Amino acid sequence: MFPPLSIRRFTGAALNDYLDAVARLRIEVFRDFPYLYDGNMGYERRYLQTYVKCPQAVVVIAFAGDEVVGASTGIPLQFEEDNFRQPFVAAGFDPREVFYCAESVLRKDYRGHGFGVRFFDEREAHAQALGGFRHYAFCAVVRPPEHPLRPPGYQPLDGFWHKRGYRKVAGLAAQYGWKDIDQPHETSKTLEFWLKSKQPSASDPVSARKSDH
């Protein structure tokens, strides 16, 4: 039986107490397909400092008792790296109106307990409390169906994301590099953006784009 499960939001310096636990969890979970990320604590600590230093950012942490078993990050797109911000600018979006639901990680044993839904709900609620956002977005790495490390029977999360109201936007993608666990060097990856709009109108850039879903 699991210890009591809970979820809490953290902003600013309050995240510091859990920084290393979240960093270790990200390395552990993102090592699996499809990310295959060969991570290290030094990079993860630097990356997570973005969320400590940005007062509008949020990290949602899932606990089993006192143990960190999941984490989900979100930040206004205007404070994200150029790799993620510029594709939106080029597509006609105002980064100040997009809240970026960056990443979610959860230990395998704790999947299927509603944490994935809560991660989206908590980040969107945080964005609503901040105000001024018309869109929520995240991205997912693109891997070929024939990838040698793709597990048998692997199912992407597209169906889950659709249920949360997100749609893949055709042509909206970023390039970002990291080292795969089976590669000697860092390589660039394509990440496709998914978007959820609050009361979209005909003037929204996404309205003129045809999604493949």
Predicted segment positions?
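Conserved acetyl-CoA-binding loop-helix of GNAT-fold acetyltransferases
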Residues: 106, 112-128
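Conserved N-terminal entry element of GNAT/NAT acetyltransferase domains
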Residues: 1-24, 28, 200, 210
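Active-site rim helix/loop that mediates acceptor-substrate recognition in acyltransferases
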Residues: 36-64, 73
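Conserved acyl-donor/pantetheine-binding loop and adjacent beta-alpha core of acyl/acetyltransferases
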Residues: 68-104, 148-149, 173-187
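Conserved GNAT acetyl-CoA-binding A-motif
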Residues: 98-101, 120, 127-153
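Helix-loop element at the rim of GNAT/NAT acetyltransferase active sites that forms part
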Residues: 23-39
